[in-house]
A protein has these predicted regions:
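Conserved beta/loop motifs at nucleotide-recognition and modification sites
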Residues: 1-344
Length: 344
């Protein structure tokens, strides 16, 4: 079943399955589906017959107890279980204990009046686990795969059209760039952009540039380009702006290293014939980020990418082991990378 089919089914009033498994890292659709499941319960009954539990902090048994209870003056109960990390291969010890034996028993005979929904925000589950096999057998599964840039464009434009709005191509391009083609971020900006664009119902470039802030990742991507261009003054100025915006120096450096790591991986694998789609799935990176990395890596030598990555690793060590000013450390890194004989 697709996302669209499930949303239509939830709105139709038709009978629902006993168990659903919503997989994938598309936060926008996770939230939209949870709202749709909640709305199958009449508003007057939602306080008693709808519940959502975060399994990172709440034992599974609490959610199952709720699922096994009869609805209170209503026809059905909906119970949502968020972040069931025990379905993955994650080895980090959980904050709470989960009774998987009780879940196995429940799945063999679900409560007829309850709709139990697992929201699993992961790329994949550990298919070797008995509980995963049993859940997939018992549940109706919906997989929220990553949207390509084209999918994001089409979906966002379709949502605007439903509201009787249009958007300039250059405005949409800028919005995608500033949000890293993250549909959740774009949809979070939609209402604000529409309100700004009244009464014309048309979103222009100035609305996007005036209202939508770039993500830290996009700012760091701009910083990467200045580093590789050996634009010391421009790179240091942007780095200073990030610090003034209260971004943590270690976080900036970590994202910088991650960007250079992605450029190196992309360059090496592209030479081996990997397509953009295969790169995204292999590296587990959003297709839009891979697209930008492919465009960037073509302009630079692997030796420069490696040198920048190692230089940033050195900056990280010094940030952690000395009291030197982060901006000074970055400035010295840039001076050295640009070709001058300076020892950091």
């Amino acid at each position: 079943m697709t996302i669209t089919q499930l949303l239509k089914h939830l709105q139709s009033g038709k009978p629902l399955d006993a168990v659903y498994l919503i997989m994938g890292q598309m936060d926008y659709f996770q939230r939209r589906l949870k709202t749709a499941f909640k709305n199958v319960i009449p508003e007057a009954e939602q306080t008693m017959n709808f519940a959502s539990y975060d399994l990172e902090t709440v034992p599974l048994a609490v959610g199952l107890d709720d699922a096994m209870a009869a609805p209170f003056f209503g026809e059905r109960r909906v119970v949502c279980l968020d972040d069931p990390v025990f379905l993955t291969g994650e080895t980090k010890k959980s904050k709470v204990e989960h009774d998987l034996d009780s879940l196995e028993k429940y799945l063999t005979a679900p409560m007829p009046s309850t709709v139990l929904v697992f929201f699993a925000p992961y790329a994949k589950l550990d298919g070797r686990k008995k509980i995963v096999k049993q859940l997939k057998k018992a549940a109706t599964t919906i997989e929220l795969g990553d949207f390509s840039e084209r999918d994001v464009r089409q979906f966002f434009q379709a949502q605007l059209q439903q509201d009787a709005y249009t958007i300039d191509d250059n405005a949409l391009n800028q919005l995608i760039q500033r949000t890293d083609a993250d549909l959740t971020l774009m949809m979070n900006e939609k209402d604000k952009l529409e309100l700004f664009s009244l009464p014309e119902h048309h979103i222009a470039l100035d609305a996007v540039t005036g209202l939508v802030r770039q993500t830290l990742t996009q700012n760091v991507f701009d910083l990467v380009n200045r580093v590789l261009a050996k634009n010391t003054a421009g790179a240091v100025a942007l780095y200073r702006e990030l610090l003034q915006a209260k971004e943590e120096p270690l976080r900036i450096n970590a994202i910088l290293q991650g960007q250079f790591r992605l450029l190196i991986q992309t360059k090496v694998l592209a030479k081996q014939g990997y397509s953009q789609g295969k790169l995204a799935s292999t590296l587990k990176v959003h297709p839009y980020r891979v697209k930008l990395a492919l465009q960037t890596q073509r302009r630079f030598q692997l030796t420069d990418l490696n040198r920048a990555y190692l230089g940033l690793y050195k900056v990280e060590r010094q940030m952690k082991s000395t009291a030197l000013d982060p901006e000074l450390l970055f400035s010295l890194f840039m001076t050295q990378f640009a070709g001058q004989k300076v020892t950091v």
